[in-house]
Amino acid sequence: MRVSLFLQKQIIECSKAFQPHSTRLQWPKSQDKVFVAMSGGVDSSFSAYLLKSQGYNVEGVFMRNWLDEDSAPSGCPAERDWATVQKVCKKLNISCRRFNFEKEYWNLVFEPSLDLYENGLTPNPDVSCNRQVKFGALFDALKKHCENNVKGDWWLASGHYAKSVVNIETNESHMCIPTDKRKDQTLFLCTIRKEALEKTIFPLHNWTKENVKKQASSAGFKEIAEKQESQGLCFVSPNVGRKFRKFLQRYLNFSDRPIKVIAGKNVVGEFSGNHGIWSLTVGERCGLSLPQAQSEYFGRWYVWKKDIKNNALYICRGTNNELLMSKCIYLKDWKWCGTKLQNLEKSALSCFVRVRHQQPLQPAKVTWRNPESVKIHFQDKQRAVTPGQVIAVYVNDVCLGGGMVDTVEPEKDFD
């Protein structure tokens, strides 16, 4: 598709703006107030330590997002984490405060995720939690607090592995990939509001996870550095095991009808209705036992499509079956992160795309069909792109934003 001269110029200018020499690190001045979002983990604790050691006026903030501890999956016991945060803040000689966002988390993250599960999709609760709660409700609460209680500028610091920079000419904020590419968490942050990004810093932007743990131990936080990383509800997917699936069963509706399992045009088996079609994800192995002695059923079978209306699950043989592959997908609910490019409708932009966490960036052509709908055509085939997941788009190492996978065009369809 032909690109207008105006857009060509804009892309060139945009690309120039994202060059390292055109940006500076977004960072507070010595007199600024810095609130550190703390979870009790090593990343946020070490972030607070770094800022305190650099002489900043630091205050820890802790969020409780889940009300009923007994009903939560084994992930992040809030009271124990709050006690750890208080202990760290006392050691650093900084104050800390606690915010309760159970209502916001339930209404803005958990219930929408349940709706997606019930419609056969696989959501990213961690992405919506960052946008709606950490860089939404928490940011708004801090902003309101600072209007009357803080003189001068203030910042929100997060222990995420990401980097916030400012364009020297336009003074606009951008989010970039950090030094530790393996721990890069920009995918989880790709939809946060521009207003929040402009006030956010990431102290670990030039640190590796290995060095964070090493230095945290040396700084007196050995117990925190050595404990197993916990994952709260935001960061859990159905793939992690039966415990989370059992937890979701308390909230999701089930069909009385059995789930039909279809290979090609043939029904090859059934799951009981209480299994929950929502618990099966595109790309994972099908748990149905097929007669391996018969050649037509021999091998490993994987989910490639879910049909909620007809309560059917489609499977294919082989982990790299063409039915699992796609080069063209469509996103909805697109959100910009920082710079918003103008007049992009129906014009293809060469970008990089991240489909899932820790995956290398994938070259692709990205077309904005309208302000909220995006078409992505990958250079290489992608396996098991899953409706409901969030995908992030990049120019150079700058994250432009992200959107939810709406539809996927497989490379091959059954005759």
Swiss-Prot record:
Catalyzes the 2-thiolation of uridine at the wobble position (U34) of mitochondrial tRNA(Lys), tRNA(Glu) and tRNA(Gln). Required for the formation of 5-taurinomethyl-2-thiouridine (tm5s2U) of mitochondrial tRNA(Lys), tRNA(Glu), and tRNA(Gln) at the wobble position. ATP is required to activate the C2 atom of the wobble base. GO terms for biological process: mitochondrial tRNA wobble position uridine thiolation; tRNA wobble position uridine thiolation. Its EC number is 2.8.1.14. Keywords: ATP-binding, Disulfide bond, Mitochondrion, Nucleotide-binding, RNA-binding, Transferase, tRNA processing, tRNA-binding. It comes from the Eukaryota. It catalyses: 5-taurinomethyluridine(34) in tRNA + S-sulfanyl-L-cysteinyl-[protein] + AH2 + ATP = 5-taurinomethyl-2-thiouridine(34) in tRNA + L-cysteinyl-[protein] + A + AMP + diphosphate + H(+). ATP binds at A37, M38, S39, G40, G41, V42, D43, S44, M63, G159. Pfam families: tRNA_Me_trans, tRNA_Me_trans_C, tRNA_Me_trans_M. One of its GO terms (molecular function) is tRNA-uridine 2-sulfurtransferase activity. Its main location: mitochondrion. Belongs to the MnmA/TRMU family. Residues 124-126 are annotated as: Interaction with target base in tRNA. NCBIfam families: PRK00143.1, trmU. Residues 183-185, 356-357 are annotated as: Interaction with tRNA. GO terms for cellular component: mitochondrion. It comes from Schizosaccharomyces pombe (strain 972 / ATCC 24843) (Fission yeast). Disulfide bonds join C129-C234. This is Mitochondrial tRNA-specific 2-thiouridylase 1. The record marks H160, R285, Q389 as: Interaction with tRNA. InterPro entries: MnmA-like, MnmA-like_C, MnmA-like_central, MnmA-like_central_sf, Rossmann-like_a/b/a_fold. The active site is at C129 (nucleophile), C234 (cysteine persulfide intermediate).
